[in-house]
Amino acid sequence: MTEPRHESGSAAPQRPATDPVQRQVNLLRDQKRNLDKQAAALASQNEKLVRLLNASRQEIVGLKKTLAAEAEPPATYAVVLQVNHGRRPVGEATGDGPVVTGPTLDVLAAGRRMRVAVSPLVSFGACEPGLGVLLNENYVVVALLEYERTGEVATVKEVVDHDRVLTVGRSDEERVLLLSGRLRRERPKPGDAVTVDHRTGFALEPVTRTDVEQLVLEEVPDVSYTDIGGLGPQIEAIRDAVELPHVHPEIFREHGLRPPKGILLYGPPGNGKTLIAKAVARSLAERSAAKAGRSRPEGYFLNIKGPELLDKYVGETERQIRSIFANAREQAARGVPVVVFFDEMDSLFRVRGSGLSSDVETTIVPQLLTEIDGVEQLDNVMVVGATNREDMIDPAVLRPGRLDVKIRIDRPDREGAREIFSLYLTPDLPLRDEDVARAGSRALAAEELVAAAVQRMYAREPETEFLTIGYRNGTSETLYFSDYASGAVIRNVVDRAKKQAIKTLLTTGRRGITAEHLVAAVDEEFHEQQDLPDTEDSEDWARLTGRRGDTIDSVHMASHRPQGEPGPGATP
């Protein structure tokens, strides 16, 4: 074979065995052999891991079955007293590091206090004091239950610390109880009712006292001063007492004058005392909203009906009064005005030692005085009382500094009755077409109806005489039905006229309220009132007339138509 030659004619040199390309090839072959060995080793390890994983899975399934079997009945009921997170036991040697115990629970089971372990199937984070749990035969917690749903109810008197409260239970027994996990989150306040378990020493859950809540809380009433008729001077006096301190607080501070803390509205029944109290609440809310730049008035009207607070158990009425004022303080602390309105105030706060009742007022009156005096530093709380027996209220309640402003709400006169009738007889009611045509407009026709009703109600005629009062000085006075008129009576008269108009429409087909309907309604209303009150006691009549009973010597009823005879009134 002819060897290749160079151009010069000499033979080509041989390539050495250590050529770089050959070395690279050999290196790659070595790496491949190593990778093959590693792959084989990994495959072997993977097979071992698969076998181990399958074995572990089977073992876990077996353990779960074992744990589940431990939770099967029979089991012991217990209550969690304390949750113990993992920590180093006190007095134990530390060695190379801290010795830590696992999470445990202190429980009370069958009267025994024990420290027990918690099953892995139970969420330890959900364990909290007061909660019910189940223990298996090895005293391991295997299930979480709920709080005891029954038990005695006690009232929180004082919060001792973050996990204890002082409660008052039956027979005024005071006990310090631990708070359950739920109550520790909700933070009970003095006056709150809670269920208690004296066996474990826990206050468990809050209880809503609907007997108090349903009596008191109401948003801003939708009653304004314009909705009240016939009480112009009284409303003006109330607005001066209530609104001026809020509209011009700097002037009052300059003169060293404090706003009044309370108002007493007294006078005959049915003349708008409750409406005035609601209007006061709305007025305060509107003034407060304007001052704070809020578009929507915000406030609260706590309407307390006196007789509903009375309770046969000693101390229960006082507790409810404390709860009411605590509610008022809580709302006032938000910067909104609160009106606490006591209707029928004489039923709660009678003169102490009068002997006219069971003397429960000996403790109720001091409780109210304490609460009113406590309102002194709250600018947003106003106490309003209403009564038609102001002479029966304890003088300590009425003194200046408590109920500062006292306003008598009298029966309406002729002009006042016209204003009240105008609130109920409005042009949008069904009116007779001929009456509207004769008057010229619906508004004028409604005014004519008002005039007819007022004329009949305030007529001084023999048939409208109600009774004759003889005084001890020898004089006498004849009272007419109009002397017993009130806003409630006027509204009832209008309602009677509306019912008569409906009956006329159903029987004759003629639509609309007429003056004849109103006149007949006035007569029927007053004749029904003729025998009320059914008494010869001058004290009762003095209360209705506004005269003092000690000046009245005799009362003689006027003689009118027999009871049950149809009232006068033209046929519509």
Swiss-Prot record:
Positions in coiled-coil regions: 21-67
Record key words, sorted: ATP-binding, Coiled coil, Nucleotide-binding
GO MF annotation, one: ATP binding
Assembly notes: Homohexamer. Assembles into a hexameric ring structure.
Biased composition (Acidic residues): 527-539
A Gene Ontology term for the protein's cellular component: proteasome complex
GO biological process terms held by the UniProt record: modification-dependent protein catabolic process; proteasomal protein catabolic process
Protein name, entry field: AAA ATPase forming ring-shaped complexes
Residue ranges, annotated region (Disordered): 1-22, 527-572
Family annotation (NCBIfam families): pup_AAA (TIGR03689)
Superkingdom classification of source: Bacteria
Binding site for ATP: 270-275
UniProt family annotation: Belongs to the AAA ATPase family.
